[in-house]
């Protein structure tokens, strides 16, 4: 086997449709578009969501909800992520320095997911009840 003898398996490749190349091709003259009408024209067709003039679904259904702007700057931190932080004190800046949270994050909450291996001091972060118990069991403490 040589590079110049390699070829795709039989039937793996399909020849492209060659439109408008004579009556014998089966796709000559109208090129598979039929006769007349909007879709036979160049640039023909309707926009996405158009239902022929009927009130479209996206306008029939009511608007609902909103996106909380605070959610965009809030993040959850797993207990297992605390191991990535250098030092014993964990706060917003040390989490950002360790790339645990993004730089745009302003609020963080430590949640019970994974395990905390060493005693750490949590400063200025919110902590769930389960995470608080796990941190204190490991010898750490939480400062508000």
Swiss-Prot record:
Biased composition (Gly residues): 21-31
One Gene Ontology cellular component annotation held by this UniProt entry: cytosolic large ribosomal subunit
UniProt signal peptide: none
Residue ranges, annotated region (Disordered): 1-53
Gene Ontology BP terms: translation
UniProt KW keywords: Ribonucleoprotein, Ribosomal protein, RNA-binding, rRNA-binding
Domain of life: Bacteria
Free-text function comment from the UniProt entry: Binds to the 23S rRNA.
Entries under NCBIfam families matching the protein: rplO_bact (TIGR01071)
Name this protein carries in UniProt: Large ribosomal subunit protein uL15
